[in-house]
Amino acid sequence: MQTIERTTLSELVGNEQYARKVLPFIRGEYFGDRTERIVFEEIQKFVEKYNALPTKSSLEIEIDSRRDLNEDDIRRVLTVVKELENDKDVNFDWLVETTEKFCKDKAVYNAIVEGITIIDGKDKARGPDAIPS
């Protein structure tokens, strides 16, 4: 089943117009799955460094050379990269609108979780006064 996360990753690799429009607003923390987050971070690093979209091959090479991942992690992340398929028929406006909603929903969710962590006293760096009133 295709998810918005996988669709986003696929389009970030194969659709330059989409990538230029949405990449500045997407954060790694929006990806709940660690393997998808790693793929996103590699795409983001590549675009920042080369001002171009990465190919699946360049992503595979970059991921394979990471020293912070064990072999099992690398294998899972490379599987995600291999499964990325750009959908040439996807409606651009729908794609951007759906991605914007995904980003907003994840940002709100993450803020709520962070607030609960602070209220529960599990955040050692911030107390309840860190939550805006």
Q: Which ranges hold each PLM region?
A:
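Noncatalytic partner-interaction/assembly domains of nucleic-acid and motor enzyme complexes
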Residues: 1-102
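Interdomain "pre-motor" coupling segment immediately N-terminal to P-loop NTPase/helicase cores
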Residues: 83-133
